[in-house]
Amino acid sequence: MCVGVMGTALASPLYPLYQAHWGLQPSHITGIYVAYMFGALASLLFLGRLSDRFGFLPVLRHGLVLVTAGVLLSALAWSVASFVVSRVLIGIASGMITTSASIGLTQLNRSSNVMRASAMTSFAMALGFGLGPLVGGLMAQWVPQPLVTAYAPSVVLGGLAIYALHQVQLPRPASAAAPGRFALHDWLPRITLPQPALRRPFLIASLGAFSTFGIFGLYASLA
């Protein structure tokens, strides 16, 4: 999860360089941010149940492959359009990685302590979101051709993580359905609310998460 999230946030300090290199307007930068969020939102809504169907490990592997491919495409981007495509891919991969890794941490937690699994998930995400801009900023300042070389650490770490995950073999969870073709209703999102007694803390927590990511996006856009 940490490596995948790092790849999603790595480009934030590079946007001023892209703006100077391609002569971008502020609206172009906004569009690039929206492209990533569109991919992430679509992934969370329509691909969030893949882990229930196939298990978290295959979904996590494919998510890491996709985010590494998106980061590599970012390094090779030759126009705004190609960079937007890379950000959409990274957004889709971000949703796959965060959902599957969160489920995996919960399932592999031997103590069955949900709070501990949640803390580990939050720590991994925060570390990845912090390392991404840090590595991107340092590479942009000190390494030649930063619009290409800044992505190298993420590509290398992504490759290592993919290799490591393919060495891990876990039994198929009993809750996973038998392999087969997805019907249309399997792809459609199911948005539900918890029982009435838990709705207020649920909505407060959701508002807190929304505000946190909104503030992060605001400051990242001003970097």
Describe these PLM feature segments.
Residues S112, R116-Q169:
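Helix-loop-helix hairpin linking two adjacent transmembrane segments in secondary transporters
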Residues P201-A223:
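Extracytoplasmic gate region of multi-pass secondary transporters
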Residues M1-P26, G217-A223:
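Extracytoplasmic
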Residues G31-R49, T98-I103:
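Central cavity-lining transmembrane alpha-helices of secondary-active solute carriers
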Residues G70-L73, A81-I90:
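Paired small-residue
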Residues S86-L127:
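Cytoplasmic helix-loop-helix junction between adjacent transmembrane helices
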Residues G23, G55, L76-S82, P144:
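Helix-breaking motifs and short loop linkers at transmembrane-helix boundaries and internal kinks
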Residues Q169-T192:
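Flexible cytoplasmic inter-helical loops of multi-pass small-molecule transporters
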